[in-house]
C-alpha cells in the first residue's frame, strides 16, 4: 500500500490520478486477493491454489500487454481467444483488480479527512444502530416524514460519467465502460432474479462501489439543495471529494422553486426550519418540522432531480408523505413512529389541589411481527400463520449442530432487535424458533415433541434460548440489579454493521 500511495503522490503534482498503469501490476491482484476485498473465483475452485491463481493473473497481464483486447468488438469473440476462453474467469480477475484500484484515491481522501477532523475510532461510527439514538433525540419534535425509495436502474454511461468527476484518468474510464458493457448486467445486480446471472454475485465489490458512487452523486446534490433552502447550513456532512462545474450544473434545479412567483413574494416559504436526512441502502428518510408544503416542495425537488440529472423516469408514487403522529415508517427492520404519551400530574397550591393532563411525544420503535413471520415461513421455520414446523433439511445434522444453528439465529435476532419498545414480539419469535428446534430434533429421533422433551434433559433447550437478561446476568453479576432496568428499556449496540436477515425480509439460513 505504501508503494501505491507513493505512486499517487507523484501523480498528484500534476493534479491527476492516473490509475490505469496499476492495472498491469501483479501485486495489485495479490492485494485484492489477500485483503479480502472480494472472493476470488479461483479460491472457490478446489482445482486451483494461490500460486496457480497468481500464475494465471500473470498470464492475463502478459496478454493485456501484448494485445489491446479491450478494443475488440464483442461479436469477434470467436476470433479472439481472450474473449472466447475463460470469459468469466478473466472478468472476475479484472473486476477484482479494478475495484481495488479505484478505491485507492477514495480511501486516501477518507483517511486524510478523518485525520483533519481528528476522528480516531471511525469503526464505532459504522454501526447502523447508532442512528436510532439520533432518531430518539430529534424525530420526536418533527411533524412530517418523506419516505423515499431511491430509483434504479441507472444507465451504465451515467455511472461512468459520475466517476469522471473524481477520476480524471480517461484510460481507466474507457476500460470500465467496456467492461460494464461487455460483461456486466447492472440491472440484475440491483434487482436479483432467480434465473439471473451469477456474474454480479462474483463481482459484488465492483458493483457495490459503482452503486455507492451513484448514491453519493445523488446525496451530494441533495445536500447542496438543502443548503440553498435552509436557515442553517448543514454541519453534519463533510465534503470529501472535489467537484467540477457542480454549482453551475445545479443552478437550474434550484431555480425550479426559488423563481416561482408565490415563493418570491414570501421568502419564509423557501427556508426550511428544521430537517433531517437518513439513508440505508435504497431506503432514505427525510423528516421535517415544517408544514406539508415543505414536504411537497422536496418531493418535486427529488422528482426533478432524478429526471433531469440522472435521466430516469422517477415515479412520484415512490415518495410517500406521512405525518409522524398518525403513521409509522419502516427503517432498518423497525417500525418507527412518534406517539403521544399521556401523563397526569397532581399539583397543589396552598389548600387547592388539581390535576394536569400532560402529553409528551415519544419516539417508538416496534418489531414488525407480520413481515418477520413471513420471513420465518419462507425459511421453513413455521407456516404462514406462525405455527412452528420442523426443519427437514437440518434433520441429518447432529443434535448439537441443530441446537447451535437455532441458538445463533435466536441470539442474533435478539441482539439486533434489542431496541424494541415492547418485548412481546421478541418472545413470539423466540417461541417459534424454540418449538421449531424441538420439532426438528423430534423428527430426527422419530418421536413426538412431548416424548422427546421428557426423554432429554430439561435444560437442553433452555441453555441456548437464554434471554438477553440472562446474558447480562452472566456478564455483569454484581451490577445485575441496575442492568435489569436497562434490559427492560431499549438497548442499542455499536457492533452491528449490517441489517439482520430476518429484519431485511430476505432470510438466508
Curated annotation (Swiss-Prot):
The keyword RNA-binding applies. One of its GO terms (cellular component) is chloroplast. GO terms for biological process: mRNA processing; RNA splicing; tRNA processing. It is found in: Plastid, Chloroplast. GO terms for molecular function: RNA binding. It comes from the Eukaryota. Keywords: Chloroplast, mRNA processing, Plastid, RNA-binding, tRNA processing. InterPro entries: Domain_X (IPR024937), Maturase_MatK (IPR002866), Maturase_MatK_N (IPR024942). Usually encoded in the trnK tRNA gene intron. Probably assists in splicing its own and other chloroplast group II introns. Belongs to the intron maturase 2 family. MatK subfamily. This is Maturase K. It comes from Avicennia marina (Grey mangrove).
